[in-house]
């Protein structure tokens, strides 16, 4: 049998294919978005999404063009100028007297009056001019240096913005994981109370306990449910904050379930100790110091002469080179120009003193920043060391609280402990587990702060920039 396809059949077939592949693509996209994201993925998204970084990158690109523009100052300038002039009826009047003056006009030289009578006519003029700097007192050299220093400042500003964003996204990332763990903890705590309420109700039904004991646990059960609701709301808000940083909706964010471990912290800290990165602020201040030094040399160049070559070719009509004939005439010229400063009443000296103060100020800023950064690094090292010790102790407290809860639960079944004892043990366990979560997050956040103060985040930003440019 031979099948015949009409236009409607092709339309239905095409629609089915589009819907099928579209559904698969959408499902694949949702699966990709919903996949747990690592810290590195969140960092990359934040660096690509942040508007402040994009503006700083635009400034850096503009500074690169400034460097290229400064290089052209070494090259000759060629200009063209032209004009059309209509002198009017009274602009040039014919001579009405005899130009042959006795005693003045040389013997044998007679200028007829009709030859020196100039009738009004239009004037056309134009020409090319070339100007080539030869020696400008070092102005062009220093201008190129200043352009490069400005470009360095702009690129380091990009790194500084990126490091700020990285520190922000790190903190938001760990906060989401912290609240995520708090939600799990609240769910576990509520589950423990639910089982305890069920057990006590069974015991109460057998007449082995009082209704008062059941009500005590039910009150705790209600409190645990409220805590769970608050934790879930906090998780949604923390995801919204992280999503605003990385450019995703809160529903699209799913992070790795585990908070950083001691082994991961140790490896990251070891890598940090071996890093030789430098803060962008220090690099920027060094560039600023070099910029002020070049500016001082630029001011001192005002004491030196400027030498330049000039050349050109000009046209004019009427042709002044051939008795003002009504045609186009031209001639070339070449020369050397020299400009020597002589007297400015001390203005240049005062400008040099101002430049000296700017250099001294830049040196002090650099020294002050180096001292402050050294102090910040030491402070953050202490904070991270304290966080690691706190994480160690809270982990031990959590293990002890778990053991205490287990023993108390067994004693309750044997009649050796009361409901009050089991509630206290559960509360102690919940508090110890919550403090353990906070301690691990604090250790991760303080490590991120240490990475920023030591310059490791700037190195990460630099590597990310190189990878983006290679793509």
Feature map (PLM): residue ranges:
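Acidic, low-complexity, intrinsically disordered peripheral segments
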Residues: 2-6, 28-32, 79, 86-92, ...
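Small/polar (Gly/Ser/Thr/Ala-rich) solvent-exposed segments
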Residues: 54, 77-92, 115-121, 131-160, ...
């Amino acid at each position: 049998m031979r099948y015949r396809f009409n236009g409607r059949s092709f339309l239905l077939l095409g629609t089915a294919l589009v819907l099928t592949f579209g559904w698969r693509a959408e499902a694949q996209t949702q699966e990709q978005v919903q996949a747990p994201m690592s810290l590195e993925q969140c960092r990359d998204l934040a660096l690509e999404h942040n508007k402040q970084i994009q503006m700083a990158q635009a400034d850096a690109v503009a500074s690169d063009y400034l460097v290229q523009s400064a290089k052209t100052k070494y090259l000759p300038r060629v200009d063209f100028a032209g004009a059309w002039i209509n002198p009017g009826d009274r602009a040039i009047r014919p001579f009405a007297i005899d130009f042959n003056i006795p005693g003045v006009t040389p013997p044998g030289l007679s200028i007829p009056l009709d030859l020196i009578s100039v009738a009004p006519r239009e004037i056309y003029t134009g020409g090319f001019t070339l100007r080539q700097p030869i020696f400008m007192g070092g102005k062009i050299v220093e201008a190129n240096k200043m352009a490069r220093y400005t470009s360095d400042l702009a690129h380091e500003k990009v790194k500084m913005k990126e490091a700020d964003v990285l520190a922000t996204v790190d903190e938001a990332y760990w906060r989401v994981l912290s609240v995520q763990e708090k939600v799990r903890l609240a769910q576990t705590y509520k589950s423990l109370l639910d089982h305890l309420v069920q057990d006590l109700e069974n015991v109460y039904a057998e007449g082995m306990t009082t209704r008062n004991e059941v009500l005590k646990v039910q009150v705790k059960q209600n409190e645990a449910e409220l805590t769970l609701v608050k934790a879930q709301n906090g998780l949604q808000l923390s995801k919204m904050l992280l999503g605003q940083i990385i450019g995703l909706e809160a529903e699209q964010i799913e992070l790795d379930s585990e908070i950083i471990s001691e082994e991961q912290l140790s490896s990251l800290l070891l890598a940090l100790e071996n890093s030789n990165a430098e803060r962008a602020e220090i690099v920027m201040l060094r560039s600023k110091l070099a910029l002020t030094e070049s500016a001082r040399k630029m001011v001192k160049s005002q004491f030196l002469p400027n030498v330049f070559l000039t050349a050109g070719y000009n046209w004019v009509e009427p042709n002044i080179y051939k008795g003002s004939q009504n045609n186009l005439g031209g001639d070339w010229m070449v020369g050397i120009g020299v400009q020597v400063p002589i007297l400015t009443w001390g203005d240049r000296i005062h400008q040099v003193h101002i430049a000296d103060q700017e250099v001294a100020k830049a040196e002090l800023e650099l020294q002050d920043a180096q001292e402050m950064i050294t102090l910040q690094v030491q402070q953050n090292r202490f904070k991270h060391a304290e966080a690691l010790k706190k994480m160690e102790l809270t982990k031990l407290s959590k293990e002890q609280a778990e053991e205490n809860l287990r023993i108390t639960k067994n004693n309750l079944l044997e009649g050796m402990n009361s409901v009050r004892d089991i509630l206290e043990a559960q509360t102690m366990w919940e508090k110890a587990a919550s403090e353990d979560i906070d301690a691990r997050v604090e250790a991760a956040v303080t490590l991120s702060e240490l990475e920023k103060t030591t310059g490791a985040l700037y190195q990460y930003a630099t590597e990310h920039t190189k990878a983006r440019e290679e793509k």
